[in-house]
A protein has these predicted regions:
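Conserved structural position within tetratricopeptide repeats
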Residues: 4-7, 40-41, 72-75, 106-110, ...
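TPR alpha-solenoid repeat register
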Residues: 15, 49, 83, 118, ...
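Canonical tetratricopeptide repeat
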Residues: 18, 52, 86-87, 121, ...
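Residue-level recognition of tetratricopeptide repeat
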Residues: 21, 55, 89-90, 124, ...
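Register position in tetratricopeptide repeats
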Residues: 25, 59-60, 93-94, 128, ...
């Protein structure tokens, strides 16, 4: 059905967005990137289009290229909370520029202090900085706002383990398994439990 619509309106931005999102949902990031390139050639493309293009680049391992685009977005709009969060979380995952990651996520939380995803990122940045007590505080708050997020729950379990709170860690990991759908992630969580 979607492909039929695309054949009828191949240059319609709304249709192209739907197609790009379809490919992204199927983890076909390269096709999604090609479509976002077409969208970005349009004079009416938005910052959101650039964000989605950059996040797809990141998904195929082109973090350095994506990072340049994310910083361009932040230069244009320093209060773009989603970009601040994305970059902060990615820096934490890569364990690089943790001071900058902390600065960015704190800025996002000043704008949206009750955002569970942002609190998770702050918790994860603190975890990577080995500030485990601080990390637990933010991760517990994040879990209270996102009680079915397997990723956030898993992060909390990891943090409990670092604080030698093994029983609580296992409890959180078992809870995370209830909500996790990705098979590879399920295997990783089960390995932690065992």
């Amino acid at each position: 059905e979607l492909f039929k619509i695309v054949s009828l309106w191949p240059e319609n931005r709304f249709v192209l967005h739907r197609l790009a999102n379809y490919y992204k949902s199927k983890k076909n990031y390269k096709k999604s990137i090609k479509i976002y390139k077409r969208i970005l050639k349009d004079h009416q493309s938005s910052d959101r289009d650039l964000f989605l293009y950059a996040s797809n680049l990141d998904k195929i391992g082109k973090w350095d290229d994506a990072k340049v685009l994310f910083f361009k977005l932040l230069e244009k709009n320093p209060k773009d909370t989603h970009t601040l969060n994305y970059v902060s979380y990615k820096l934490a995952l890569k364990e690089e520029e943790l001071g900058l990651a902390l600065k960015f996520i704190k800025k996002a939380l000043m704008i949206d202090p009750e955002n569970g995803y942002f609190l998770d990122t702050l918790g994860w940045v603190e975890f990577k900085r080995k500030k485990y007590n601080s990390a637990v505080y933010f991760l517990e708050k994040s879990v209270s706002l996102l009680p079915k997020s397997s990723e956030v729950i898993d992060h909390l379990g990891d943090c409990y383990l670092k604080l030698n709170r093994k029983r609580e860690a296992v409890f959180e990991w078992k809870k995370a398994l209830k909500y996790e759908t990705d098979k590879a992630t399920v295997v990783k969580i089960r390995e932690k439990i065992n």
